[in-house]
From Swiss-Prot:
Protein name: Cysteine-rich venom protein hematin
GO cellular component: extracellular region
GO terms of molecular function: calcium channel regulator activity; potassium channel regulator activity; toxin activity
Family, similarity comment: Belongs to the CRISP family.
UniProt-annotated location(s): Secreted
PTM characteristics: Contains 8 disulfide bonds.
Tissue: Expressed by the venom gland.
UniProt keyword terms in alphabetical order: Calcium channel impairing toxin, Calcium-activated potassium channel impairing toxin, Disulfide bond, Ion channel impairing toxin, Potassium channel impairing toxin, Ryanodine-sensitive calcium-release channel impairing toxin, Secreted, Toxin, Voltage-gated potassium channel impairing toxin
Lineage, highest ranks first: Eukaryota, Metazoa, Chordata, Craniata, Vertebrata
Native organism: Hemachatus haemachatus (Rinkhals)
Length: 30
């Protein structure tokens, strides 16, 4: 249970990082 929870949080954090990165690229192109 803890492992699954930890993995889920990690995945969410990574996704957030990717979204931030995409937003930054968009601003640059933008």
């Amino acid at each position: 249970s803890v492992d699954f929870n930890s993995e889920s949080t990690r995945r969410e954090e990574k996704q957030k990082e990717i979204v931030d990165l995409h937003n930054x690229l968009r601003d640059x192109v933008x």
